[in-house]
Amino acid sequence: FVLRIEDIDRERAGSAQRQLEDLEAIGVDWDGEPLIQTARADAHEEALASLAARGLIFECYCTRRDIREAASAPHVPPGHYPGTCLTLSESERAAKRASLAALGREPALRLAAPSPEWTVFDELHGSYTGPVDHFVVRRADGVPAYNLAAVVDDAYQGVDQVVRGFDLLSQAPAQAQLAHLLGAPEPTYAHVPLALAPSGARLAKRDGAVTLADLRGLGWSTAD
């Protein structure tokens, strides 16, 4: 059992320690030292360089508002990037890059996905084919995007089966296609049902959900 601390989202400071405490509280142990995702920056950059060398990356100059407005077009799947910056000319790219630089900003990097869809195998749902858009692989702040970091680190750790919540099933085709492009094995998946409130929404504190830390505070032990 290997453990990875996915800490590239700096806004979730302190969550890693809480996760370790939760695992210890239910008696789960792991082999070796946890892999710290932010310590793998060199490997993530190597993956980006490999994609760039094959023309599989392009700069994106869009704001969230730009994407939201363009994504409302009827031919764009809900939540997907509409490809605004994919086919810009070099002169257009230079102008947009200069405009961002004047604002002290950098462009994000997106995958020029070769296939608009990909099929994965899920242990619970069988063969699943989903759309793959030109998703972000490096954010505008220079931090590798989660999808890229997770795929690179899964390959490094030898992860061949991914078990997670059903709400992430739609992400599997994009991650599997990226693994294929990086020459990494594509894992199989098992997307399990979520714990839902009576309304059908995800269970939250307001619905009476409790954390393992809450239970520890109430005196529950590992055996409980």
Which residue ranges define each predicted feature?
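A conserved active-site cap/scaffold subdomain adjacent to cofactor or substrate pockets
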Residues: 219-221
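Active-site cores that bind ATP or allylic diphosphates and position pyrophosphate for catalysis
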Residues: 65-204, 211-216
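N-terminal Rossmann-like or analogous alpha/beta NTP/dinucleotide-binding catalytic cores
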Residues: 1-76, 155, 166-184, 217
